[in-house]
Amino acid sequence: MQLYHRYLKLPFNFEKPTLYDSVELKDYCEFIYFKDEDLLTEPILNFIDSIGLYRIQTNSVYSAPKDGIRIHSDTPDLSDKVKLSFSWGSPDSKTIWWEPIDRRKVKVVDFYESHMTRTVKCSKIKMATIPERIRLFLKGKKIGPLTKYAWAKEKDCERVLARTIDRPSLYNVGRLHSTWNPSNEGRWTLTFILGKKRNKKPLEFIESLNYFSDFIIKE
């Protein structure tokens, strides 16, 4: 049994937030944070609450045409944290999951900007290395809030699963994964980090299979 992804058939439809259409689109992938009330996510939050869960955080990601996000996990360690995901746009954009051949090759890095492209636009990655901190200090610039991610090089990983994320999904973000959008159309993804109401701990993928058992599409 694979523990990376499941498609869902939910008891409601949720259209792409109109707020996304007001965003100036870039030629690279970008993480953007919006308030739930501005995204009108109440139907999703009510559903999450009805099955004994709660939203820890809401994230929005824009996947630019012919661009992708390098191999990473959404956590500073390799785990099985799960997100509930909704996507709109390119039907060809894929998420690929990887397992490290040698865990010692997995690095934890501080990012102060979330442009983690893995293509020719990789220069947009902003890692908070010591030389970079010194460069910013000398320029009189403050380093923004830091986010820790685990990441690895493709040559140090084994590809284990690829899925087109074109419908509601459960998505293991604690394992290494990357994205690639080969089309000429962008893609928006709205994700929710989930927690269990009974103990306030983050939901793990294998646990999510029980909470969402009535809504998982069998493959």
Task: Please report, for each region that a protein language model flagged, where it lies by residue.
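Catalytic core of non-heme Fe(II) oxygenases with the double-stranded beta-helix
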Residues: S63-P168
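Short loop/turn segments at secondary-structure transitions that flank enzyme active sites
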Residues: G89-D92, H177, K196-R198
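Short beta-strand His + acidic residue motifs that chelate non-heme Fe in jelly-roll/DSBH
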Residues: R70-D74, Y171-S183, T191
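A short hydrophobic beta-strand segment most commonly corresponding to one strand
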Residues: V82-F86, P168-L170, E185-P202
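Non-heme Fe(II)/2-oxoglutarate
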Residues: M1-Y62, G68-I69
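Short conserved micro-motifs at the rims of enzyme active sites and ligand-binding pockets
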Residues: W97, P182, K201-E204
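Long, compositionally biased interface segments
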Residues: T191-E219
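Well-ordered, non-membrane alpha-helical segments in soluble/globular domains
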Residues: D38-L45, A128-P131, L209
